């Protein structure tokens, strides 16, 4: 199976990123293909690449400082930017299962639920 994690798990040395990486390594050992789609940290740091996990980074939010923060805050409510970024990778990866790790917007989750029914992948 192809499993895709989506969430803010691309920041090095944070509990969520370490948790997802360890789970992905375990799932890979069980024979699954694992991808992680995450935000790029504002400082540009990335997770250490490991053979078991393929990290894909979303485009950063536009602007800098307060402008970037405003886009991020709006996306916490509406999830539009996050959803568009997700769609860019779904065609490439074609997952069987998507795991939303701490999704940022209920509207994003609802869009993903509708998409899962249309495209036929399982959503966790």
PLM-predicted stretches and their roles:
Residues 1-44, 48-53:
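N-terminal subdomain of nucleotide-sugar transferases
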Residues 36, 55-57, 123:
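Conserved beta-strand scaffold positions in the cores of enzyme catalytic domains, especially
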Residues 43-44, 105-110:
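Short, well-ordered alpha-helical microsegments
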Residues 53-84:
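A short, charged, and often flexible helix/loop element on the N-terminal side
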Residues 82-90, 112:
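Generic hydrophobic alpha-helical segments
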Residues 87-107, 121-124:
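Short N-terminal targeting/anchoring amphipathic segment
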Residues 112-124:
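Charged, glycine-enriched surface loops/patches
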């Amino acid at each position: 199976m192809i499993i895709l994690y989506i969430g803010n798990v691309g920041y090095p040395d944070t509990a969520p990123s370490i948790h997802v990486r360890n789970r992905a390594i375990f799932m890979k050992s069980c024979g699954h293909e694992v991808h992680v789609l995450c935000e790029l940290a504002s400082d540009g740091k990335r997770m250490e690449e490991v053979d078991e996990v393929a990290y894909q980074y979303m485009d950063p939010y536009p602007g800098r400082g307060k402008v970037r923060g405003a886009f991020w805050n709006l996306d916490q409510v509406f999830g539009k930017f996050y959803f568009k970024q997700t769609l860019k990778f779904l065609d490439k990866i074609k997952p069987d299962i998507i795991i939303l790790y701490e999704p940022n917007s209920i509207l994003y989750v609802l869009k993903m639920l509708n998409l899962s029914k249309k495209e036929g992948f399982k959503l966790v």
